[in-house]
Amino acid sequence: MSKKAPGANVIAQNKKARHIYELSDNHEAGISLTGSEVKSLRAGHVNFRDSYVDFRNGEAFLVGLHIAPYDNAGYAQHDPDRDRKLLLHAHEIENLARSVEQKGYTVVPTKLYFARGKVKVDIAVGRGKKLHDQREDLKRRAEDRDTQRELARF
């Protein structure tokens, strides 16, 4: 049997996060889910555009992650917008919480994927970009695309 392609197990990516924030310090975190939530994720019914990580009582929670109810779950439906606990080591939570205390910094999810049958979340520390920085980024990416097209032509 052949192995799956390396990027085939990605559930969703938060492309908007790269546009709004300057991202650094990536971490892989587990996430505490119910069975119907995992089945809904396998179907791709997730939206985490406005989600972020909140720190309470020495624990990390993913807030704003919307996982649509699973169609075949029956009467035991999950709350689609509940806060979900992230599974990180205590020292990782302390480091992330310390970085969020600085003004203008937040922790945002960048990717949701399956790794060895478990759902994982890629989170990163982000600092909000100003509007002119976002525009400069778009211009630079457009120029890079144009140069790649020119190079591909020859």
Swiss-Prot record:
Region annotation Disordered: residue ranges? 134-154
Known PROSITE patterns for this protein?
A: SSRP
Q: Does the keyword RNA-binding apply?
A: yes
Q: Which InterPro entries does this one have?
A: SmpB, SsrA-bd_prot, SsrA-bd_prot_CS
Q: Which Pfam families match?
A: SmpB (PF01668)
What is the name of this protein? Answer: SsrA-binding protein
Please report the organism this UniProt entry assigns to the protein.
Answer: Nitratidesulfovibrio vulgaris (strain ATCC 29579 / DSM 644 / CCUG 34227 / NCIMB 8303 / VKM B-1760 / Hildenborough) (Desulfovibrio vulgaris)
The GO annotation for biological process reads: trans-translation
**Xref: PANTHER family:** SSRA-BINDING PROTEIN (PTHR30308:SF2), TMRNA-BINDING COMPONENT OF TRANS-TRANSLATION TAGGING COMPLEX (PTHR30308)
Q: Which terms are listed as keywords in the entry?
A: Cytoplasm, RNA-binding
* Cross-referenced Gene3D superfamilies: 2.40.280.10
Family classification:
Belongs to the SmpB family.
What are the subcellular locations of this protein?
Cytoplasm
